[in-house]
């Protein structure tokens, strides 16, 4: 699909998905190393990225470019990934 044939709504959602994917990659890198809770800098970066994405989603929803339910689904996916990371780190500590 070319840029010309994509609607603004599709472009907005694609950009939000790309930003969400970057955050997921950040989470997965930390899962590979299981270092997240010991690293306050990482946690600060992740919190900032999540907050920024939530603001992007809110802006796109307010413009009518993205449905609120779709934006919530993106954030929910990130929350699940983050929860998985916390569980993995907790299991590592118990061992």
Curated annotation (Swiss-Prot):
UniProt family annotation: Belongs to the UPF0358 family.
Name of the featured protein: UPF0358 protein GK1077
Species for this entry: Geobacillus kaustophilus (strain HTA426)
């Amino acid at each position: 699909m070319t840029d010309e044939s994509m609607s603004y709504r599709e472009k907005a959602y694609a950009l939000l998905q790309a930003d969400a994917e970057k955050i997921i990659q950040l989470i997965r890198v930390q899962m590979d190393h299981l270092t997240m809770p010991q690293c306050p800098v990482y946690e600060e970066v992740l919190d900032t990225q999540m907050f920024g994405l939530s603001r992007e989603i809110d802006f796109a929803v307010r413009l009518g470019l993205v449905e609120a339910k779709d934006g919530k689904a993106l954030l929910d996916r990130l929350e699940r990934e983050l929860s998985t990371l916390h569980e993995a780190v907790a299991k590592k500590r118990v061992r």
